[in-house]
Amino acid sequence: MIEIKKAKPTSPGRRHVVSVKNTELHTGKPFKGLVEVKKSKAGRNNTGRITVRHQGGGHKQHYRIVDFKRNKDDITAKVERIEYDPNRSANIALVLYADGERRYIVAPKGLKKDMSVISGEKVDIAVGNCMPLRNIPLGTVIHNIEMKPKKGAQMIRSAGTFAQLVGKDNAYAIIRLRSGEMRRVLLDCRAVIGVVSNSEHNLKSLGKAGAKRWRGIRPTVRGVAMNPVDHPHGGGEGRTSGGRHPVTPWGIPTKGYKTRRNKRSNKLIVQKRK
């Protein structure tokens, strides 16, 4: 059961908090055999320089090893529990295969404890089942989509997201993404049936800066508040508007300027996003 709770304004830090509580989530520790140490990099590379801004601090986390390939074919897996994962917006499910192996998978919406999932070439069209796109009927809602066969899911993995299979053309399937983009994907690529879980994730409000810091997210300082040495918008006597069109700290236009490079996979885009 999902509970959306707005905190009472007992303090400035509680006034804007909106929390989403799922009573079906496992409250204990993760399965020990499927976690590994996640070392905090604080946005630095191997030379110690900041390569990703606004990262650092936060609570220690363990990385949950999630199975994105779903390559254990024709063996039924029973859902043992649904868990919170600090490394992604979606929930994850711990599944136990009939041969005794356990794996984490991204939990789709509607998947509950004691339900079963299976992957393979020709399996039932049911929530949580994984199969090649060639065997999925048109109009089906899918997630966890591979971009290359056997590489593992790379698209549609965030909370509440989904794509729709709208066509099949020779060796390719045509899928419609949430952005409105229509894209061709090889029919041998796999996908999972259903919508990704935790669709209420966007309703959550952290309410205070400290909650961001717990997650390892540091403040974003405006360029106009910096010195000229630090940002193209910096400097000036008194408050200024920057004096030029908005740019990044490296002088590249921002606020709507498209920076996506042309890739070889561009030819697979049938219709650009809206």
Swiss-Prot record:
<dbReference type="InterPro" id="IPR008991">
    <property type="entry name" value="Translation_prot_SH3-like_sf"/>
</dbReference>
<dbReference type="InterPro" id="IPR014726">
    <property type="entry name" value="Ribosomal_uL2_dom3"/>
</dbReference>
<keyword id="KW-0689">Ribosomal protein</keyword>
<dbReference type="GO" id="GO:0002181">
    <property type="term" value="P:cytoplasmic translation"/>
</dbReference>
<comment type="function">
    <text>One of the primary rRNA binding proteins. Required for association of the 30S and 50S subunits to form the 70S ribosome, for tRNA binding and peptide bond formation. It has been suggested to have peptidyltransferase activity; this is somewhat controversial. Makes several contacts with the 16S rRNA in the 70S ribosome.</text>
</comment>
<dbReference type="InterPro" id="IPR014722">
    <property type="entry name" value="Rib_uL2_dom2"/>
</dbReference>
<dbReference type="Pfam" id="PF03947">
    <property type="entry name" value="Ribosomal_L2_C"/>
</dbReference>
<dbReference type="InterPro" id="IPR005880">
    <property type="entry name" value="Ribosomal_uL2_bac/org-type"/>
</dbReference>
<dbReference type="InterPro" id="IPR022669">
    <property type="entry name" value="Ribosomal_uL2_C"/>
</dbReference>
<keyword id="KW-0687">Ribonucleoprotein</keyword>
<dbReference type="GO" id="GO:0003735">
    <property type="term" value="F:structural constituent of ribosome"/>
</dbReference>
<dbReference type="GO" id="GO:0019843">
    <property type="term" value="F:rRNA binding"/>
</dbReference>
<feature type="compositionally biased region" description="Basic residues">
    <location>
        <begin position="257"/>
        <end position="274"/>
    </location>
</feature>
<protein>
    <recommendedName>
        <fullName>Large ribosomal subunit protein uL2</fullName>
    </recommendedName>
</protein>
<dbReference type="Pfam" id="PF00181">
    <property type="entry name" value="Ribosomal_L2"/>
</dbReference>
<feature type="region of interest" description="Disordered">
    <location>
        <begin position="224"/>
        <end position="274"/>
    </location>
</feature>
<comment type="similarity">
    <text>Belongs to the universal ribosomal protein uL2 family.</text>
</comment>
<dbReference type="InterPro" id="IPR022666">
    <property type="entry name" value="Ribosomal_uL2_RNA-bd_dom"/>
</dbReference>
<dbReference type="GO" id="GO:0015934">
    <property type="term" value="C:large ribosomal subunit"/>
</dbReference>
<dbReference type="InterPro" id="IPR022671">
    <property type="entry name" value="Ribosomal_uL2_CS"/>
</dbReference>
<keyword id="KW-0694">RNA-binding</keyword>
<dbReference type="InterPro" id="IPR012340">
    <property type="entry name" value="NA-bd_OB-fold"/>
</dbReference>
<comment type="subunit">
    <text>Part of the 50S ribosomal subunit. Forms a bridge to the 30S subunit in the 70S ribosome.</text>
</comment>
<dbReference type="GO" id="GO:0016740">
    <property type="term" value="F:transferase activity"/>
</dbReference>
<dbReference type="InterPro" id="IPR002171">
    <property type="entry name" value="Ribosomal_uL2"/>
</dbReference>
<keyword id="KW-0699">rRNA-binding</keyword>
